[in-house]
């Protein structure tokens, strides 16, 4: 195992933050795994520690067939943000920016540099594109902030990967994944191993999130150069490992073994591993997800559990105004999987309370919430 420590730029006087990468194995193929980019989403970090131990063991046994890079703490900035006893890990407090938005878009500068050098050899194209992605990131002007510097380091390690896992969670949720529709056939095994509730599929959710910054450039390049052989060569996903409180030992170990079993299936680990379950969740268009909001201020009482299938018109939660004796029941506007609910129980208009993944598209434009 090799430990790589990257000091982040623009640290405050008298302090320094470091992004640590743990590199296992050797070879031409690569997996990149990071956890807790939203720093208060800790099931991924706990799972990453299980992975760290198991990968060291597998490496010592000579079982790894390729490189696996692991970043257990992908956001040391957000890990250090606490306000009056509450961890604030989703947004950078100084700028208000979401830590998982606005990553560098690589396809345009890559196309400008190598468009005339792409041909019919897919493997040669993959190698050239990956090399150029790294060059583009290395040649950018110095980062203007610590957040920008951290973003570049994360993307620099992931841009040449064959498989990228970005480990997150939701407030109270079933396990679910976000991915490209083109990659869903490959992800079905991991979803089944994790017993995920749903997969949300789209090419562009509108936020330049980390996983899409790894996977979507390949689609854009393939469309820009239709005569060239350009496969979607970075299999990237945002993997939501359930609820914010899902950090029990058994949960982390189960997540770890599911991920390792998937990587073994993909040829990165030798040995005997359990076969993926036959039963798997549905892959649904992210355009089919409904966000449900409270119509007024009040206390929320949820009537259904995260992970349940609900029908259009089913009552999902009540909002109670105890001063004016006003009670409003909010119902599902689409049939699908109630895959996440808010953790807060006092709400206001404009704050989402529940998410239902449906089979039919009902939204356009920006799909992801901040």
Give the role of each language-model region:
Residues 1-370:
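Structured catalytic-domain cores with a bias toward divalent-metal coordination
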């Amino acid at each position: 195992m090799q430990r790589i420590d990257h000091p982040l730029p623009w640290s405050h006087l008298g302090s320094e933050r470091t992004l640590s990468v743990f590199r296992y194995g050797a070879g031409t193929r690569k997996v990149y795994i990071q956890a807790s980019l939203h720093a208060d989403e800790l099931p991924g970090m706990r799972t990453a520690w299980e992975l760290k131990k198991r990968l060291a063991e597998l490496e010592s046994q000579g079982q790894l067939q390729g490189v696996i890079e692991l970043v257990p703490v992908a956001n040391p900035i957000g890990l250090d943000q606490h306000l009056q006893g509450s961890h604030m890990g989703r947004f950078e407090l100084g700028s208000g920016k979401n830590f998982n938005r606005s990553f560098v878009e690589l396809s345009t500068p890559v196309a400008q540099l190598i468009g005339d050098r792409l041909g019919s050899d897919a493997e040669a194209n993959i190698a050239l594109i990956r090399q150029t992605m790294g060059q583009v990131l290395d040649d950018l002007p110095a980062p203007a902030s610590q957040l920008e510097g951290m973003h570049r380091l994360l993307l620099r390690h992931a841009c040449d990967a064959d498989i990228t896992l970005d480990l997150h969670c939701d407030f109270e949720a079933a396990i679910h994944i976000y991915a490209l529709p083109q990659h869903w056939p490959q992800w079905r095994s991991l979803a089944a191993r994790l017993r995920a509730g749903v997969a949300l599929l789209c090419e562009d959710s509108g936020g330049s999130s980390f996983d899409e910054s790894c996977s979507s450039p390949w689609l854009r390049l393939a469309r820009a150069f239709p005569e060239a052989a350009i496969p979607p060569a970075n299999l990237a996903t945002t993997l939501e490992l359930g609820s914010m409180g899902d950090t029990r030992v058994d949960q982390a170990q189960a997540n770890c073994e599911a991920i390792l079993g998937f990587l073994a299936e993909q040829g990165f680990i030798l040995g005997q591993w359990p076969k993926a379950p036959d039963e798997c969740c549905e892959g649904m268009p992210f355009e089919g997800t409904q966000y449900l909001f409270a119509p007024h201020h009040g206390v929320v009482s949820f009537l259904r559990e995260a992970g349940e299938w609900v029908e259009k018109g089913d009552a999902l939660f009540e909002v109670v105004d105890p001063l004016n004796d006003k009670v409003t029941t909010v119902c599902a506007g689409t049939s699908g999987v109630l895959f996440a609910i808010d953790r807060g129980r006092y709400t206001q208009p404009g704050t989402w309370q529940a998410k239902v993944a449906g089979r039919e598209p009902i939204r356009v434009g920006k799909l992801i919430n901040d």
